[in-house]
């Protein structure tokens, strides 16, 4: 069974508590449960990883070489700053879809730049947790 890695960056572990007007009341555990259910239906394996530390995210990407089909990533605030994550994604050559719960282009101007987008086959922003589900369906369609 092919595996999809779902990576979440800083503060995503605080969903349900942090800025509910922006991110809603759903928790990371609920997102993972929804993705696990869909993955079972689609007959694909998902692995979840969240870190507040850029280097740990890079390590996880590098450790995934030859172990995964693709990556769904919400790099959170690292979207706008991390050339390191961009380079890690570039180095493993698997399909990547960037996901954001909020519409980063409707927020503060500094959030409008994504260093990750250039390494992704697509970006989903502003569709809440449905963005993760759409990304998983798309990733499976590429298999």
Swiss-Prot record:
Gene3D superfamilies, alphabetized: Dehydroquinase, class II
Pfam families hit by this protein: DHquinase_II (PF01220)
Protein name: 3-dehydroquinate dehydratase
GO BP term, example: aromatic amino acid family biosynthetic process
Complex formation: Homododecamer.
Lineage: Bacteria, Pseudomonadati, Elusimicrobiota, Endomicrobiia, Endomicrobiales
EC number of this enzyme: 4.2.1.10
Keywords per UniProt: Amino-acid biosynthesis, Aromatic amino acid biosynthesis, Lyase
Keyword Lyase: yes
Associated pathway: Metabolic intermediate biosynthesis; chorismate biosynthesis; chorismate from D-erythrose 4-phosphate and phosphoenolpyruvate: step 3/7
Active site: residue positions: 23, 100
Job description of the protein: Catalyzes a trans-dehydration via an enolate intermediate.
Family label: Belongs to the type-II 3-dehydroquinase family.
PROSITE patterns (alphabetical): DEHYDROQUINASE_II
A single MF term (Gene Ontology): 3-dehydroquinate dehydratase activity
Organism: Endomicrobium trichonymphae
InterPro entries per record: DHquinase_II (IPR001874), DHquinase_II_CS (IPR018509), DHquinase_II_sf (IPR036441)
Site residues by UniProt (Transition state stabilizer): 18
Positions contributing to substrate binding: 74, 80, 87, 101-102, 111
Gene: aroQ
Catalyzed reaction equations: 3-dehydroquinate = 3-dehydroshikimate + H2O
